């Protein structure tokens, strides 16, 4: 598939059609997300990476806010896609938001859906420890919850992930917007969908937040 994506002699439409056909033939669709339409793709990079026409401001409607002490954190979160991502939706009492409310450019795939409970009690303290690179403090929090400590390699991963998050916020929202603990708001309309879901962009990925006992 990657060879086809990297082939500049094929149009974007041809390459997307190939991806969709390969997806339909795939039996195990776990965490596979493929484009719904070639019209949603800005370009295909030389290495075959798909660059979508994502809306501005990390996909938030105007009115997004920085997560902080006064934020009502969700009891549950979910997302479509692998655990390396850091964009989530809360889960309302009435049930999860629809694919259209999330305004995603992919074919809907239930095998790519994941949901977690969210531990808000120590969330801010854990993110602050990562922010300050206070690994003793972080490990103290983890120990208080019966979780394994983070080692040197994990500390490096946490630092890089957090720095990447801050860089993304600066690039996509602006250097004057401070959101050390994440951003929350509603999903902007995009890809032919109205959006409207309650969205959370967190400093760490799902996988890292699982490690820290934030998601479980």
Positions of the model-derived regions?
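Catalytic toxin/effector domains delivered as secreted proteins or via bacterial secretion systems
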Residues: 13-216
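Extracellular, luminal, or virion-exposed ectodomains of exported proteins
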Residues: 2-17
């Amino acid at each position: 598939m990657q060879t086809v994506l990297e082939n500049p002699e094929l149009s974007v439409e041809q390459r997307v059609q190939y991806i969709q056909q390969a997806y339909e033939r795939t039996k195990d669709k776990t965490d596979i997300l493929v484009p719904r339409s070639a019209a949603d793709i800005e370009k295909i990079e030389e290495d075959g990476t798909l660059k979508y026409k994502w809306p501005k401001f990390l996909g938030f409607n105007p009115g997004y806010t920085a997560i902080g002490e006064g934020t009502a954190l969700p009891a549950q979160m979910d997302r479509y896609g692998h655990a390396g991502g850091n964009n989530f939706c809360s889960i309302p009492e009435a049930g999860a938001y629809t694919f259209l409310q999330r305004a995603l450019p992919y074919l809907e795939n239930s095998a790519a859906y994941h949901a977690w409970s969210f531990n808000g009690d120590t969330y801010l303290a854990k993110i602050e420890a990562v922010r300050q690179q206070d690994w003793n403090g972080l490990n103290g929090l983890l120990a208080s919850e019966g979780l394994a400590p983070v080692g040197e390699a994990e500390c490096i991963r946490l630092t890089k992930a957090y720095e990447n998050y801050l860089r993304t916020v600066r690039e996509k929202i602006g250097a004057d917007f401070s959101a050390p603990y994440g951003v929350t708001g509603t999903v902007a309309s995009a890809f032919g969908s109205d959006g409207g879901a309650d969205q959370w962009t967190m400093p760490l990925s799902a996988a890292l937040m699982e490690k820290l006992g934030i998601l479980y």
